[in-house]
């Protein structure tokens, strides 16, 4: 007859094997997974430029999504009916735009803000130049 191992021994082996699996997964997660910077560095130049160009747009979309989630969570409607995001399973909502932020409008407003900043900076520089010109208009024959 074979000696039957106690029940606690079998369960200890199960927990040990599970712990080894989880530990291996965590170890792989921290050693193999690239950081965001490493991943971006591996992008091709075109993809990297597109990523940098649309970074603020994605952040704006994320903010808008958080706002929608807050609105939806405060509503008493079911989650699939609340909020402005259309469900792909509803016939009348299938063709709705899933964009949270209008990309053209976002880029246009960003460009306008940059232009306003450049104009303000140019105005400040011209005022500074006028002030310096007023200081230098003192006649040379007066000593005091």
Curated annotation (Swiss-Prot):
Alphabetical GO biological process terms: mitochondrial respiratory chain complex III assembly
Pfam family, one: CBP4
Membrane topology summary: Single-pass membrane protein
Residue runs in coiled coils: 108-138
Keyword presence, Phosphoprotein: no
GO annotations of cellular component type: mitochondrial inner membrane; mitochondrial membrane
Localization: Mitochondrion inner membrane
UniProt keywords, alphabetically: Chaperone, Coiled coil, Membrane, Mitochondrion, Mitochondrion inner membrane, Transmembrane, Transmembrane helix
Key word Chaperone present: yes
Membrane-spanning intervals of the chain: 10-32
InterPro entries: Cbp4
Region of interest called Disordered, as start-end residue ranges on this chain: 109-144
Biased amino acid composition, Basic and acidic residues: 109-131
Function text: Essential for the assembly of ubiquinol-cytochrome c reductase. It has a direct effect on the correct occurrence of the Rieske protein, core 4, core 5 and apocytochrome b.
Family: Belongs to the CBP4 family.
Protein name, as recorded: Assembly factor CBP4
Organism: Candida albicans (strain SC5314 / ATCC MYA-2876) (Yeast)
Gene: CBP4
């Amino acid at each position: 007859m074979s000696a039957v191992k106690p029940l606690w021994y079998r369960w200890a082996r199960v927990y040990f094997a599970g712990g080894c699996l989880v530990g291996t997964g965590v170890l792989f997660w921290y050693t193999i997974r690239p950081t965001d910077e490493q991943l971006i560095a591996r992008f091709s130049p075109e993809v990297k430029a597109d990523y940098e160009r649309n970074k603020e747009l994605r952040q704006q979309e994320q903010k808008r999504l958080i706002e929608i989630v807050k609105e939806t969570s405060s509503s008493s409607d079911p989650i699939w009916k609340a909020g402005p995001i259309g469900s792909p399973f509803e016939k009348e909502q299938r063709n709705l735009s899933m964009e949270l932020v209008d990309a053209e409008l976002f880029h246009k407003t960003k460009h306008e803000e940059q232009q306003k900043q450049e104009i303000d900076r140019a105005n400040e520089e011209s005022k500074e130049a006028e002030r310096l010109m007023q200081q230098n208009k003192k006649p040379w024959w007066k000593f005091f």
